[in-house]
């Protein structure tokens, strides 16, 4: 099963890469740039799962896999972090604020075609589960990207995922990043079954793959 999945990934990656590169060539422009923002890091673990797993670690693992698939498809990728670090200085008195501002500055300086923030969710009721995508409420491009990615969750979660892309006007990066940006909450670490899936290499691969396919669809319809 794993070999078949990897073979299908190889074939589809070649087709997807051809679409992206053909689009860039016809427009005589450089390949599109995507920023992948892996949430938390350093002294900020993010959510802590019922199994003890740390959100910051899962975010980075999924982000790295997503980067691999996107680059294989001809997309230029910038990571806000590629190690267990935050974007703050040890001398910063408010590290969380400094971290968010630094991420925002990096993204705006890059001016990418889009930014995808990788996060994990948590809730006080263990039964709550599912993946959800957030976008800035007045961003038409953000909404379109969020809708595409939200539908991609059906490929990894099936019909059990009844969530819809959700507008937001309070999250710092959604407010201050100038290019299209979405936040992908991959699942709930407070749910035992979902935490186990999110820690599974196979599930991480499938999730990163399907997010990458959603991003390519968005880029190819620009």
Regions of interest found by a model, annotated:
Residues 59, 142, 146, 200, ...:
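Short, charged, low-complexity patches
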Residues 110, 124, 162-222:
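Active-site-adjacent mobile loop/cap segments within catalytic or ligand-binding domains
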Residues 37-38, 186:
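Hydrophobic/aromatic residues positioned on beta-strands within the core alpha/beta folds
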Residues 19-34, 40-145:
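Catalytic-core regions of hydrolytic enzymes
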Residues 1-14:
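Hydrophobic membrane-insertion alpha-helices, especially the h-region
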Residues 142-167:
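Active-site-adjacent substrate-binding region
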Residues 17-18, 96-98, 163-168:
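Short gly/ser/thr-rich secondary-structure transition/capping motifs
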């Amino acid at each position: 099963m794993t070999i078949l999945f990897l073979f299908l990934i190889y074939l589809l990656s070649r087709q997807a890469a051809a679409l992206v590169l053909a689009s860039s060539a016809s427009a005589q422009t450089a390949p599109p740039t995507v920023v992948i923002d892996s949430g938390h890091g350093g002294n900020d673990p993010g959510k802590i799962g019922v199994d003890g797993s740390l959100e910051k670690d899962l975010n980075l693992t999924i982000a790295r896999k997503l980067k691999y698939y996107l680059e294989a498809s001809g997309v230029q990728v910038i990571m806000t972090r590629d190690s267990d670090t935050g974007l703050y200085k040890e001398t910063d008195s408010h590290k969380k604020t400094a971290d968010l501002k630094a991420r925002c500055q990096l993204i705006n300086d890059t001016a990418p075609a889009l930014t995808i923030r990788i996060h994990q969710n948590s809730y006080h009721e263990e039964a709550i589960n599912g993946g959800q995508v957030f976008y800035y409420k007045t961003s038409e491009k953000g909404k379109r990207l969020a809708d595409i990615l939200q539908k991609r969750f059906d490929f990894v979660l099936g019909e059990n995922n009844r969530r819809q892309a959700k507008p937001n006007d309070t999250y710092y990066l959604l407010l201050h990043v100038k290019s299209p940006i979405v936040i992908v909450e991959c699942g709930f670490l407070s749910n035992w079954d979902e935490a186990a899936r999110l820690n599974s290499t196979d599930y991480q691969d499938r999730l990163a793959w399907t997010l990458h396919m959603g991003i390519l669809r968005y880029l190819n319809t620009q």
